[in-house]
A protein has these predicted regions:
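Bacterial N-terminal signal peptides
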Residues: 17-29
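Metal-dependent phosphoester-hydrolase catalytic domains
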Residues: 38-44, 215-226, 233-331
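Surface-exposed cleft-lining segments at the edges of enzyme active sites
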Residues: 72-77, 151-160, 188-203
Length: 331
């Protein structure tokens, strides 16, 4: 009897370590599978082949009033936030970015839009306390983990109309493999030098603050790739953008390996004009006419932009004057 007990005990001792190995494998497997691939891989408009991260950027036009402008009423249209919010939700769910950046994001629109996209898995990285953040970053919670977030409102107030000009920076870790990158979303001062002398230098100074912020981020997290996106209210050839390019920032459309949209990304949409596909920018092309930009700083040369696109779906024309920008890249 004693021998049989020993044999039985040995079997248990052998079995238990194998059981632990199997359980450990299952836990690791579940962990990997729960850290999903980019949501854009299953979106209506799927992630480009060989890309693994998607950024979607848009200035969504702050119209926080609860009245319909006469021009819109004459067109039989309604630009109020509760009407436009479902269309922005459609945009976001059609493309399902890992990272979403918005400008002119009012608290009024937040009440309408955020509940819609939160249920899709998006988290706002900085909800304002004292100051409302008009330039938020959202991330897809199942694929991304924030390591660092900062909001900065530009000063002095003369270059920051109603507190709307700011930047939000975020450092994100991809849950599936731990790779880290950063995104900075901004909206710069809007007037020309003719309207308000010093405006170009104000924008240049605001971008210098972003460049300093990027240096701080990279000092802390290493030479990670950084995307700077948003409505910069100036063309690529101007001093504000050229200072960034001189420091190694590259416009994403110029390095996209599979597709690069070259339109200026802007059209008529406002309370007084209604909406149309007419563009009033300085030029029809991106280099000379665009004011919405996406630049990449990648000193290691490991990040590849696959697609840079300007989304011109018909329904977007009457929800904002800025066509949304999309960047698919391989981290």
């Amino acid at each position: 009897m004693r021998d049989s007990v020993v044999v039985k005990d040995m079997r248990v001792r052998v079995f238990v370590p194998w059981l632990l190995v199997v359980l450990n494998f299952l836990v690791v497997s579940v962990g990997v599978s729960s850290a999903q691939a980019s949501p854009a891989s299953k979106a209506r408009y799927k992630l480009a082949e060989s890309a693994d991260v998607r950024i979607l950027d848009d200035n969504i036009w702050d119209y926080s009033l609860d009245t319909i402008p006469p021009k819109w009423k004459a067109m039989g249209e309604d630009p109020r936030d509760f009407v436009r919010a479902p269309q922005f939700e459609r945009l976001i769910t059609d493309y399902m970015p890992d990272v979403l950046t918005l400008q002119e994001y009012s608290s009024h629109m937040h009440d309408e839009l955020y509940p819609r996209i939160a249920k899709e898995g998006y988290v706002i990285a900085w909800e304002s306390g004292k100051d409302w953040n008009n330039t938020p970053v959202f991330y897809y919670e199942k694929t991304m983990e924030p390591l660092y977030v900062k909001y900065h409102k530009y000063t002095p107030a003369q270059w920051c109309n109603r507190g709307t000009k700011s930047f939000t920076s975020i450092v994100l870790k991809r849950k599936s493999d731990g790779q880290v990158f950063s995104v900075v979303n901004t909206h710069l001062w809007w007037k020309s030098d003719q309207m308000q002398p010093g405006s170009t230098m104000a924008r240049a100074s605001q971008l210098r603050l972003i460049m300093a912020e990027v240096e701080i981020i990279r000092a802390r997290f290493g030479s990670i790739p950084v995307f700077v996106v948003g409505d910069m209210n100036c063309e690529e050839k101007t001093v504000p953008l050229q200072q960034m390019i001189a420091e190694g920032y590259v416009p994403c459309y110029k390095v996209a390996v599979k597709h690069a949209d070259n339109s200026n990304g802007h059209h008529v949409c406002g309370p007084d004009d209604g909406f149309s596909t007419e563009s009033r920018r300085a030029a029809p092309d991106r280099e000379n006419g665009a004011i919405d930009h996406c630049l990449l700083l990648d000193t290691e040369g490991k990040t590849e932009v696959i697609v840079f696109d300007c989304i011109m779906d018909e329904y977007t024309v009457k929800i904002t004057d800025h066509y949304p920008l999309l960047v698919d890249f391989k981290l």
